[in-house]
Amino acid sequence: MLGKLMKYELKATARYFLPLYAAIIVLSFFIGIRTYEGPFLSLLNGILPTALVLSFMGLAVITMILVVNRFDKNLLSDEGYLMFTLPVKTTSLINSKLFTSLIWIFGSFLIFILSMFLIGWRYFEVDFFRESFRVIFSEPYFLIIIFLLLVMTIVNFLLQVYASLGVAQAYSVTKSRILGGTIIFVGIATFFNVIESLVVFLGTLLFRDNQWIQDMALQLESDYFGDILPALRILLTVVLLYTILKNVIFYVLTKYHLNKKLNLE
């Protein structure tokens, strides 16, 4: 059933993303092959990059709006009556929104990479990329941690949005769920920032004389990446585990409010 829900979500959102993807690719292609000869082409050299920047800005705005709007309208408004009568678990409803948003976010990232390639393909050095890939793939654990941290950070943002909207609708924080969700989102972010700052401060105060901590600090201050890598692995692993913990909290919070505190209009 999750597959059917995701298929429905992808169809409902594709009409917004695909035209922008096409526009970005076309603009990037023409920017990549442009020349500076003639007044008309010189004018295009100014117009095309501006249009591309505006397209990327539009893509970012649409992504944000759809993340909020699809969850709000589809689950927390009148459409929610239909969605919650379907023979599916609440987790499937949450997952369909989450996975679909992830697909479009990573799709947008790939479009950005393709756009940069189309724009600068004449200036790329094969040897530079070959060496870069060799260095990157020589540290598979580091690469995996970076990838997982990227995914979990995006998931963290999405689940925090969902949890904020769930809390806002359950307790009628404001007449507008979006406004209420924004207030809750900022409140949650502030709370975790304060907690994180306190933990870092107390950790520095209590463990500043610890030899292991001092060795890690020295490694991170090194100018040679090979010296930094061991400490960086540990640091990123801790950050990854902490991000996963927050994701679990936000997921449980979202599920609880959809199951027990749903207040449909």
Show where each model-derived region lies:
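Short helix-to-coil transition segments within interhelical loops
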Residues: T85-K89
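Hydrophobic alpha-helical transmembrane segments of membrane proteins
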Residues: M1-E79, T90-E265
